[in-house]
Amino acid sequence: MKALVVDDSLVMRKVLIGALSRANITDVDQACDGAEAVAFAEKVEYGLVLMDWNMPNMLGIDAVRGIRALGKTMPIIMVTTEAEKSRVIDALKAGASNYVIKPFEPATIVSKIQEVLNKVGTTI
């Protein structure tokens, strides 16, 4: 399975790639903003996307909307410092599959990855 990690922080992208590796997902593309994420999703069939909220050029929630507007149905997990309940609800309404608040324990993100993939019948 191919995954996409979207975050403007290189350090966070590396952390998320490490979490994906722990979930046995090693084929990973990286994007540094929402606009780049939508462009990637238009060209590549991803099995999973990990998306930050606050990024330059296009917010993560707008990228989720853009990806869903393309007809893409892959799981998208928001991984963000936006901890307000209203943000979680907004993300889920926009099409996010799940939500993880930074900072997080590595086991938490791995568990969320497995959870969303199980919901869509994907095994890793």
Predicted regions mapped to residue ranges:
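Acidic, metal-coordinating helix/loop segments flanking the phosphotransfer/catalytic sites
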Residues: 30-48
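Two-component/phosphorelay signaling modules centered on CheY-like receiver
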Residues: 10-29
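Receiver (REC) domain active-site loop signature in two-component systems and cognate sites
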Residues: 55
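Acidic catalytic/metal-coordinating carboxylates
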Residues: 33-36, 59-65
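Short, conserved "switch-loop" micro-motifs in signal-transduction and mechanochemical regulators
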Residues: 82-83
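C-terminal output helix
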Residues: 104-113
